[in-house]
Amino acid sequence: MMELSRSLVVEEAESYRESEPLVTVEDQHLDILPGMFADGEFGHRDAEWVVRWYFRRFLGRYPDAERRRREEQFRENDFDRVHTLLGELAGMDVDEALDRLTALDGVDVPVATAFLQFADPDSYLVVGEREWSVLHEAGELSEPSPDPLSPAAYETYLSRCRALADEFDCDLVTLYRALWRLSTPDE
């Protein structure tokens, strides 16, 4: 069983910074999107970027047809509805945010958590099977990744991640990046 530690998280997050090709643009969006969403100063492409990032971070390991289908579904949403929702995220609790985000076409709980991460990276982090599986294998989550991922499961994951970030004295983005690297399939 893998054991998570502060040193492992820091090391793997640094590996992420050195090796993940999307890290620069991801950093830029983590820096600018929270304010843009909160202020309502964003366009459709800014919102669409989050959906594209969720799938494209797999670097071709996510089925292309499914990725394209989900991206197209998201593009079909009424932008005024998306704009209003993203502008109101900061005032919502996690249940309401997930409920409203998953009501959008092309957005399931994992994609909704990407929106939460980019709206408030100090409070939320994205989840998918890969990240969840690392925590399960390390004994930090008792159950394997549910399929489909429910809002209640995300809250369990988020609570555990917040506790680990506190324990390891790191932010949630650092923890996410470590989990992603620890779940990277062998090349």
Where are these regions (language model features)?
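Homeobox/homeodomain signature
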Residues: 40, 91-97, 116-117, 165, ...
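Helix-hairpin-helix/helix-loop-helix acidic hairpins
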Residues: 59-107
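A short glycine-/small-residue-rich loop at the edge of a beta-strand within enzyme catalytic domains
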Residues: 88, 92, 122, 152
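Catalytic DNA-binding helix-loop module of base-excision-repair DNA glycosylases/AP lyases
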Residues: 96-137
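Generic alpha-helix signal with a bias toward terminal, lower-confidence helices
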Residues: 62, 86, 113-119, 136-139, ...
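C-terminal accessory module of base-excision DNA glycosylases/AP lyases that mediates lesion recognition
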Residues: 1-57, 124-187
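Generic alpha-helix detector with strongest preference for long hydrophobic helices that associate
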Residues: 31, 82, 96, 111-116, ...
